[in-house]
Amino acid sequence: MYQVLTPSRSSTLALRHLNYHVRHWGPEQSDLPTLVLLHGWMDVSASYQFTVDALRQSRRIIAPDWRGFGFTTGTPVDHYVFADYLADLDLLLDHYAPGEAIDLVGHSMGGNVAMMYG
């Protein structure tokens, strides 16, 4: 069985009529930019556990569960467009990393969001 090296913490943020679940690893503060990990379609933030453990850095890392995935609530109608993901990301960063430089990494759909955001 896999032994987690860096346990995560969870928080929930009311955002655009949804309850967003965000997973956190590492210290609350770091001299390094916050690393923001964006998961792909049909995935969840917890899938980054292996990546976080492999990094072995004392760095603040956050990863949201996108709307309708993991522990984040979904919309009443299955309506998912990139404009919503970009707006959600903008507000998430305003809350968790206001005015900070960040390193933004995405996989699959999360990579598309990261590229469009940058």
Language-model-derived ranges and their functions:
Residues M1-V36, R56-R59, D94-E100:
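Alpha/beta-hydrolase fold catalytic core
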Residues T12-A14, G40, V77, V81:
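Pocket-edge positions in alpha/beta enzyme catalytic cores
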